[in-house]
Each structure stands twice: as C-alpha cells, then as structure tokens.
Amino acid sequence: MTKKALFTGSFDPVTNGHLDIIERASYLFDHVYIGLFYNLEKQGYFSIECRKKMLEEAIRQFKNVSVLVAQDRLAVDLAREVGAKYFVRGLRNSQDFDYEANLEFFNKQLADDIETVYLSTSPSLSPISSSRIRELIHFKASVKPFVPKSVVREVEKMSEE
C-alpha cells in the first residue's frame, strides 16, 4: 500500500521552513502532494501561477513530491481525490500547535480516516514565516537567507519592474 500525504498552505511565498517540512515528509511517505490553496476572495502577494512556479522549482530535487493547485475547496476533499491518508503539518511554536489542533479537530469530523502528522520545524528555521518574508520584501530587505532561490529570483524581478 502506497503511503500518500498532503501538505497544504498558501505558500505566499514558499520559505526554507516549508522546504524543511517537505523534505522530511518526502522521507516518511511514498508520495507527498503539496496542496497550494488559494481563495479568489483574497488577493495574494504573489499570483497563484507565480507561487506554483516557485514551489515547483524549489521541490524539483524531490522525486516523490508534486504540487496541486486547489481553489475554494476543503483539504479533506483534495486528500480524498488524490488518495492521501495523511495530512502533514509543520509546527514552529505553540501558537501553531493550537491552530493546527483546532484544524485537526474539524478535519477528523469530516474525514476520520485521514491522520494528521505533525513535524516540528528545525529550530534554526522556526522564526521564518511567509508574512515576515512579505514584510521584508515590502521594505526591500534581503530575503536570501530565508527562502529558496526560486523566490529570490521572483523578488529580484519585482524590484526591476
């Protein structure tokens, strides 16, 4: 039986913290789907196409990881569609745990056959968040230490425009 997992987020943008979780999940599961979720009602910092491109470039070295774009749907529905029996969630701190535990409660109500697996972010990466990265970009500070090269390239393109 193939063990498939789903790791969801907006990845606006993808960070080295996300990649840490993706890499470790790729060792635990036969296939990891990255569910790139977005809501048409909300304006992302990067377009969905750009986020997908940055993610795909960042995960290229992982042969058992792929990106799926999901619009206005529940993670449990996408998990069922791809046959994933596990949600992978990254934890940076206790606030993340509180949020994720609440999310797990509702996911279990909707799909009690899908387990949630928590992976703690590596301590050196735990302060990194997409919202902090967007703030650094806004103030034209370097994001190189915190994000994959694919994001750095997109930020540099934005600066040139």
Swiss-Prot record:
The keyword Aminoacyl-tRNA synthetase does not apply. Pathway: Cofactor biosynthesis; coenzyme A biosynthesis; CoA from (R)-pantothenate: step 4/5. One of its GO terms (cellular component) is cytoplasm. Its cofactor is Mg(2+). It is found in: Cytoplasm. Keywords: ATP-binding, Coenzyme A biosynthesis, Cytoplasm, Magnesium, Nucleotide-binding, Nucleotidyltransferase, Transferase. Substrate binds at S10, K42, A75, R89. The record marks H18 as: Transition state stabilizer. NCBIfam families: coaD_prev_kdtB, cyt_tran_rel. This is Phosphopantetheine adenylyltransferase. It comes from Streptococcus agalactiae serotype V (strain ATCC BAA-611 / 2603 V/R). The lineage of its organism: Bacteria, Bacillati, Bacillota, Bacilli, Lactobacillales. The gene is coaD.
